[in-house]
Amino acid sequence: MQKISYVIPCYRSQHTVGGVVAEIAATMQTLPQYDYEVILVNDCSPDDTFGTIRSLVAADNHVVGVDLAKNFG
């Protein structure tokens, strides 16, 4: 099975990243021939973006979270 990886930089995204993951999951349900992962990269966001990412990781085994120690732009 082929795999698609979505790598999404996140900055001040605590209120929007969940919707993005939900849209990707809905799209991938229409493509059963592919496995997928969503890699959410918190770019040292000052809000609770990484808290939201942690919740998404706990709820969906397709989601991986990365927390950067400083903003890389």
Which ranges hold each PLM region?
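Glycine/alanine-rich phosphate-binding loops at beta-alpha junctions
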Residues: 18, 36, 43-44
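Short, well-formed alpha-helical segments that are part of the catalytic scaffolds
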Residues: 13-29, 52
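A generic structural motif
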Residues: 31-36, 61-62
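Aromatic-flanked redox-active Cys/Sec active sites in thiol-based oxidoreductases
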Residues: 10-12, 43
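Cell-envelope/extracellular polymer assembly enzymes that use nucleotide-activated donors
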Residues: 3-5, 37
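A conserved acidic beta->alpha catalytic loop
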Residues: 42-50
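Conserved donor nucleotide-binding strand/loop of the catalytic core
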Residues: 50-73
